[in-house]
C-alpha cells in the first residue's frame, strides 16, 4: 500500500472520486465541502445496513454531537464531524476494521486534513470516544434485534446508555437521507455560529 507521504507528494491530481455536485475530491489533495459531506453521510447506512430502519452516518453524527453537548463531554462540533472522513471512504463495521488494517491508514489520510480544515484536535478526544460509544448502544437499543445485550464496551458505557436511553434529546429518528442531510446541515450551522 502507498503511504500517505508518498501519496501527498504526487503532483498529478489523478486520484479522485466524483462528488454529488459533479466536482472532484482529490485523495492526495483533499478539500472539504460541507454540503457534499452531508449528502454522502446521509446516504450511508450504519451497521452495514443490518438495522430495522435506515439509519445514516449523518444522523449518528448529530447524536454524538448532542451527547457531547448535553453530557458535557467536550466540543459538540467535534462530535458532529468525528465521522466526516466516511463521506469519502464509507462507513465500515468495526469487526471488518480489525481485518483491514490498511483501512485505518486510509481513514487517517483523510481525517488528518479534515480535522485541520475544521479546526479540530488532531485526534479524537476521550469525550468524543465516550459519546460515540454511548451512541452505539443507544442506536442498537432502538434499531437492532439483539439490542446490543451481548456486545462489549468500555467500563460504565452500558450503564450510562441505559440511564439516558429515554431522554428525548437522544432519540434516534431513523431519518430518510434527505431529512438526515438537512438535520446534519442545520446542526452544522448552529454549531458553527456558536463557535464564531
Q: Model segments located where?
A:
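Metal-dependent phosphohydrolase cores
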Residues: 1-196
Amino acid at each position: 500500500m502507498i503511504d500517505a507521504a508518498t501519496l501527498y507528494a504526487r503532483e498529478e491530481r489523478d486520484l479522485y472520486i466524483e462528488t454529488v455536485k459533479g466536482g472532484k475530491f482529490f485523495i492526495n489533495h483533499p478539500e472539504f465541502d460541507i454540503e457534499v459531506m452531508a449528502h454522502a453521510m446521509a446516504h450511508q447506512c450504519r451497521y452495514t445496513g443490518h438495522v430495522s430502519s435506515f439509519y445514516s452516518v449523518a444522523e449518528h453524527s448529530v447524536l454524538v454531537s448532542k451527547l457531547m453537548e448535553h453530557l458535557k463531554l467536550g466540543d459538540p462540533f467535534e462530535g458532529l464531524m468525528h465521522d466526516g472522513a466516511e463521506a469519502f471512504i464509507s462507513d465500515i463495521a468495526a469487526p471488518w476494521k480489525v481485518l483491514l488494517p490498511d483501512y485505518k491508514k486510509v481513514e487517517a489520510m483523510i481525517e488528518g486534513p479534515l480535522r485541520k480544515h475544521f479546526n479540530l484536535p488532531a485526534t479524537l478526544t476521550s469525550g468524543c470516544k465516550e459519546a460515540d460509544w454511548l451512541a452505539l448502544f443507544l442506536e442498537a437499543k432502538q434499531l437492532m434485534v439483539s439490542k446490543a445485550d451481548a456486545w462489549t464496551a468500555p467500563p460504565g458505557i452500558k450503564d450510562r446508555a441505559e440511564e439516558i436511553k429515554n431522554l428525548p434529546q437522544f432519540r434516534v429518528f431513523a431519518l430518510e437521507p434527505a431529512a438526515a442531510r438537512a438535520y446534519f446541515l442545520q446542526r452544522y450551522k448552529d454549531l458553527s455560529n456558536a463557535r464564531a
